[in-house]
Regions:
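HotDog/MaoC-like acyl-thioester-processing domains
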Residues: 13-14, 19-96, 150-155, 161-187
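Acidic/His-leaning functional-site neighborhoods
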Residues: 101, 105-186
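Hot-dog-fold acyl-thioester-processing enzymes
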Residues: 1-9, 52-58, 63-140
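Short structured motifs
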Residues: 8-14, 26, 141-146
Length: 187
């Protein structure tokens, strides 16, 4: 059908990191569709139901051939069973950049950064941004806003700003346009 869901943004909160070997249960459910967007929650719980982490994600419905967002129709959404919207503090989808970010050393996108569509994998952007966290920084909340797709050989020019309890990283192209913006917060 020439359609795909592309992750636009997400907000992940980790209240407790499980110990190695802890049995966990992962849940996910879409909870709303609007225009060309779909919204989905995730949880990680212990087997007795204690919530360890939870997330919200926003997905854009695209035409694969053009990369342009396409309005959802009942044919696109009827097969989904909507779940309850998770009770959590929902952060805005867009991440505001501070004015005084510091440019960091640029690097080239390598093969190991790519997904099956030959673009940088969403999690790889998070790993790239983690390089700018102080060593003792324990992430409580991570937010990511995806703006453009980087491909093999593209140059990524990071900018970062550390504030009290927060680090913001913008992973830009050589013209200063962001591929992804990531915000990490401590508890």
């Amino acid at each position: 059908r020439d359609r795909a869901w592309v992750l636009s943004s997400w907000q992940v909160i980790v209240d407790e990191y499980p110990a190695m070997g802890t049995e966990i249960r992962i849940t996910t459910a879409p909870y709303d569709f609007k225009g060309f967007m779909g919204m989905r929650n995730f949880t990680i719980e212990t087997m007795d139901g204690k919530k360890l982490a939870w997330a919200n994600s926003n997905w854009t419905h695209l035409a694969i051939s053009t990369g342009v967002p396409v309005r959802l129709t009942p044919a696109d959404t009827d097969n989904y069973i909507l779940g309850e919207k998770l009770e959590m503090d929902y952060a805005p989808r867009k991440i505001k950049l501070p004015d005084d970010m510091t440019s960091q050393e640029s690097f080239t996108v390598q093969k190991h950064h790519l997904d099956t569509n030959h673009h940088v994998n969403n999690c790889q952007y998070i790993c790239m941004a983690e390089d700018f966290l102080p060593e003792d920084f324990k992430v409580y909340q991570m937010r990511a806003e995806y703006k453009m797709q980087a491909k093999l050989g593209d140059i990524i020019c990071p900018k970062a700003k550390a504030e009290t309890g927060k680090v913001i990283v913008s992973l830009d192209d050589t013209d200063g346009k962001a591929y992804a913006i990531i915000e990490f917060q401590q508890k």
